[in-house]
Amino acid sequence: MDMKDFLNVLASKEPVPGGGGACGYVAAVGMALGNMVLSLTTGKKKYAEYQEEIEELIVKAGDITNRLCECMDKDAKAFKPLSEAYGLPKDTEEQLEHRNKVMENALLIASEAPLSMMELIVEAIKLIDRISVIGSRLAISDAGVGVQMCKAALNGASLNVYINTKLMKNIDVAEDMNTKADELVITGNELADKIYDRVMDCVHP
């Protein structure tokens, strides 16, 4: 699916892609921007001391970008059981009990997908942190744009965790997932803001 088709489906009534797929896409673009900075830096005499590290980071950034794209598919697949669970009958006690059991499992699956995405986005932000230090100053603004996209995707993915855990009956599991999401939000946002400030110091007149 090309970008235009993706956006058309995203804007439609189709259940997927939704916010999760959008977050994965935005984060992948952000990581790709970071990788672009590396590509513009590699081979430059001025940054020769970092050449070996840059080559390693290009591979890592490419891997994270690919995995974020995979997260888009995983998020869509994770939402399907939840979508089906909402349609289960609940007219009798037995039906209601079955529906609640299926719903609880579906909510868990639907929460795990964005949580995994958040972990990967924080990896991307950490990588851009290093890129913003050793990357070409001529392309440093792109590292700033990339990290802002990753930050937005991280916060967006957290909402997809919380909206599902809020409905879970197993409070212990829900609280554990919320705690993990909270920590990722704090870690990712603090580092993203630090990177943004570093970039601003380089580009602002």
Region locations from a protein language model:
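Short, hydrophobic/aliphatic alpha-helical segments
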Residues: 1-16
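Amphipathic, well-ordered alpha-helical segments in soluble domains
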Residues: 6, 29-36, 78, 117-127, ...
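Conserved phosphate/anionic-ligand binding catalytic regions in large, soluble enzymes, centered on
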Residues: 12-33, 139-157
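Amphipathic alpha-helix face/heptad-repeat signature
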Residues: 25-29, 57, 64-71, 106, ...
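Phosphate-handling active-site elements
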Residues: 33-53
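A structural-propensity feature for long, helix-poor, extended segments
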Residues: 46-84, 184, 191
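Amphipathic alpha-helical interface segments
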Residues: 75, 79-148, 152, 164
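Preference for long, well-ordered alpha-helical segments
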Residues: 124-127, 139-198
